[in-house]
């Protein structure tokens, strides 16, 4: 692990732009995202450096902190990396892990053959904030709390199971550095702008890896078995984690859908001051527009109509209408005219005579100046409201419901003007009338009217 960068594993002293000094072991450097990760980090505060916000030193030791490169002011190497203590090439060894020394901060321990961090068995809960932070959004991460490490940590026996579980945590740290992700829940509570993440393992029982970007609660699930091979491909394991995360996300969406009961009515939302769309829907065909295979045949359509029957039916209607006119007591517009010459022509003999021109004669100037076509006296009654509405629906279609907004403009200005209150408006039809003003200009309410100004002005001038 230290072959690519010679300072990996060195003890680093870092000063941020907030004048806070940190000391820790250099874990990794991400050149793509310009971040630096330190392990076993301790904060020494501002240490009499000039700053607007002095920070006292802290006794807690953080598991690791990722710093943003643009916010680092100074970085020095305190101690070179410790020499690696490698085991002999024994084919019987599958995995190995060294326990920590008595001092958790001064002694780093040795890196394993796969570049993983040494594990520790005893941790204490955090006394820093008294709150738990969300898990880092990386695959396989089980680090859930922002905790501290005790200075007296016990010796962990060489257990391949713990080493295998911690390998997943170190691999997740590499993934976190390469992807540049950070937990959004850490931002409001971090003390320095350079601190991106400070996460510690919760307990000696490491839970199973969590899905990508999801919060993993602390669990007491037993450790994975020791049958995991040391030479397992890490890319294959990452692919498995990404495959598992998708069904879990789908299950989470399904659970959210089940929370809403199918028969429970949802509370309506009423917009104030905005507009609320109509509830009606257009009659849209689901199968798309109609498709015509051939052109319309006008000749065959006209052949279906029997013109003789239509003419016969039309004449029968005219005869019935004339019979109704004859039954009326007064002739059509015969007595309305005040002309004496016309009255003499409309004598009793002419009234009893039959029309020589036949029933198709609609205008006879000898009888009256007016014709029978434009006369409305033959109507028995006016159409009712229901008939008129039905006729309008057949002609123009069914209108949509009008938008029923609530609100409007209500201004309380000076000089006696008062805005409308958004009441009233048309109801029914396809167009909603604009909200009318209630009161219009309403003077004398805490203000002055124009008449008062003129009156006082005249008094001053007169005085």
From Swiss-Prot:
Residues 147-185, 194-203, 217-230 have a biased composition (Polar residues). Component of a ribonucleoprotein (RNP) complex. Interacts with DDX6. Interacts with EIF4ENIF1/4E-T; promoting EIF4ENIF1/4E-T localization to P-bodies. Interacts (via FFD box) with EDC4. This is Protein LSM14 homolog A. PANTHER family: PROTEIN LSM14 HOMOLOG A, SCD6 PROTEIN-RELATED. A motif (TFG box) lies at residues 380-400. The modification Asymmetric dimethylarginine is found at residue 401. GO terms for molecular function: mRNA binding. Residues 1-81 form the Sm domain. It is found in: Cytoplasm, P-body; Cytoplasm, Cytoskeleton, Spindle; Cytoplasm, Stress granule. Residues 284-320 form the DFDF domain. The modification Phosphothreonine is found at residue 194. GO terms for cellular component: cytoplasm; cytoplasmic stress granule; mitotic spindle; P-body; ribonucleoprotein complex. PROSITE patterns: DFDF, FFD, SM, TFG. Residues 269-283 have a biased composition (Basic residues).
């Amino acid at each position: 692990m230290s072959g690519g960068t010679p300072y990996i594993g060195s003890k680093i002293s870092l000063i941020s732009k907030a004048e806070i000094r940190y000391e820790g072991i250099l874990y990794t450097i991400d050149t793509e995202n310009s971040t630096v990760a330190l392990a076993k980090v301790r904060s020494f505060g501002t240490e009499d450096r000039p700053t607007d916000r002095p920070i006292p030193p802290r006794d807690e030791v953080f598991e690791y902190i990722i710093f943003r490169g643009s916010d680092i002011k100074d970085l020095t190497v305190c101690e070179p990396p410790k020499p690696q203590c490698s085991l002999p090439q024994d084919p019987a060894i599958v995995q190995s892990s060294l326990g920590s020394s008595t001092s958790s901060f001064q002694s780093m321990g040795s890196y394993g053959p796969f570049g993983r961090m040494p594990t520790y068995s005893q941790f204490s809960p955090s006394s820093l904030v008294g709150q738990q932070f969300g898990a880092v959004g990386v695959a396989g991460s089980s680090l859930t709390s922002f905790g501290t490490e005790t200075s007296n940590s016990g010796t962990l026996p060489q257990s391949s199971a713990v080493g295998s579980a911690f390998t997943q945590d170190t691999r997740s740290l590499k993934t976190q550095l390469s992807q540049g992700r950070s937990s959004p829940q850490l931002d409001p509570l971090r003390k320095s702008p350079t601190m991106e993440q400070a996460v510690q393992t919760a307990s000696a029982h490491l839970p199973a890896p969590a899905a990508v970007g999801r919060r993993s609660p602390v669990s007491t699930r037993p450790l994975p078995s020791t049958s995991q091979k040391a030479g397992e491909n890490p890319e294959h394991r990452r692919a498995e984690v990404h495959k598992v995360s998708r069904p879990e996300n789908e299950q989470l969406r399904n659970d959210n859908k089940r929370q809403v009961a199918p028969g429970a009515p949802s509370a309506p939302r009423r917009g104030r001051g905005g507009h609320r769309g109509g509830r009606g829907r257009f009659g849209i065909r689901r199968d798309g527009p109609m498709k015509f295979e051939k052109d319309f045949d006008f000749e065959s359509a006209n052949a279906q109509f029997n013109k003789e029957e239509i003419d016969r039916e039309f004449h029968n209607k005219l005869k019935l209408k004339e019979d109704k006119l004859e039954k009326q007591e007064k002739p059509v517009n015969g007595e309305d005219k005040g002309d004496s010459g016309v009255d003499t022509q409309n004598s009793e003999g002419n009234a009893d005579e039959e029309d020589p021109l036949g029933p198709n004669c609609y205008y006879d100037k000898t009888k009256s100046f007016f014709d029978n076509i434009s006369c409305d006296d033959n109507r028995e009654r006016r159409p009712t409201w229901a008939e008129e509405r039905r006729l309008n629906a057949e002609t123009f279609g069914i209108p949509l419901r009008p938008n029923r907004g609530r609100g409007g403009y209500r201004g309380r200005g000076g000089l006696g003007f008062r805005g409308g209150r958004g009441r009233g408006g048309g109801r029914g039809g396809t167009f909603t009338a604009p909200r009318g003003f209630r009161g219009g200009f309403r003077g004398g309410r805490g203000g002055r009217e124009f008449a008062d100004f003129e009156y006082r002005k005249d008094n001053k001038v007169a005085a």
